[in-house]
């Protein structure tokens, strides 16, 4: 995998990374001039760990215009986000190979939430639940952070402000996943196959998704040719029929379902 950027309205994507290791985008910097991404590429001679690229990934930063990536931290992590001030990273750790989508388990590899002060390089573990704590995102204004936890039995959203926690969702049947937050404090997440948005102190609502095409390939759509035939002719042996549909010539068997 490599990192690309493109306008939300569609258009040509710009490739930012070219390394043979998988590069996974995480966040934009507050000034929108750089992208944070995780990669298992070598971090330099100070890192003496010999690890699998599937497990520990380092956090890098690269300009949205391209260029050489810059290493930010060698700590193995995932789901990394940067705050509005650009001086703190919040992330979930990655202790082992346990499936990210496994539910209702407690073990030595369940994920926890950490913060990294980019000025002091200090790491602080925030979560204490023995099960899964996942996908942290900063609340706008640096007042707190949201994250997913299974402490209620199923993954739900919690708001943490200075150690005081407030439950935001209360689902029981299925887990909440893919959490993000906008600058106006509107949450976005998936639940039971649908995409939801939830403004602060309001109810969640499912939304319709329209995906923009990047314009590199023609759009494809499966169409039936059993109707709309304009001309046809029977073959001399009576076994095939040639016909025209939407300006294209097709041949179909009289007995059978094969059409070319």
What are the language-model segments listed below?
Residues 1-4, 17-24, 33-60, 64, ...:
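A flexible loop/linker signature enriched in serine peptidases of the S9 family
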Residues 27, 81-83, 137, 179-180, ...:
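Conserved beta-strand position repeated across blades of beta-propeller domains
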């Amino acid at each position: 995998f490599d990192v690309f950027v493109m306008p939300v309205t569609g258009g040509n994507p710009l490739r930012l990374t070219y390394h043979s290791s998988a590069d996974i985008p995480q966040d934009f910097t507050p000034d929108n001039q750089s992208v944070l991404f995780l990669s298992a590429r070598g971090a330099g001679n100070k890192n003496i760990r010999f690890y699998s690229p599937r497990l520990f990934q380092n956090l890098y930063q690269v300009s949205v215009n391209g260029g050489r990536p810059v290493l930010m931290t060698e700590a193995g992590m995932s789901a990394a986000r940067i705050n509005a001030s650009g001086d703190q990273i919040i992330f979930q750790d990655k202790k082992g190979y346990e499936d990210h989508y496994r539910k209702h388990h407690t073990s030595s590899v369940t994920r926890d939430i950490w913060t990294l002060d980019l000025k002091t390089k200090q790491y602080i573990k925030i979560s204490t639940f023995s099960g899964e704590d996942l996908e942290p995102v900063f609340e706008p204004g640096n007042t707190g952070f949201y994250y997913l936890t299974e402490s209620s039995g199923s993954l739900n959203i919690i708001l943490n402000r200075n150690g005081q926690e407030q439950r935001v969702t209360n689902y029981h049947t299925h887990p909440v996943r893919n959490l993000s937050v906008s600058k106006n404090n509107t949450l976005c997440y998936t639940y039971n196959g649908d995409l939801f948005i939830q403004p602060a102190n309001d109810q969640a609502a499912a939304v319709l998704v329209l995906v923009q095409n990047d314009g590199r390939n023609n759009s494809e759509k499966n169409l039936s040719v059993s109707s709309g035939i304009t001309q046809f002719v029977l073959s001399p042996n009576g076994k095939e029929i040639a016909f025209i549909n939407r300006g294209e010539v097709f041949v179909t068997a009289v007995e059978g379902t094969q059409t070319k």
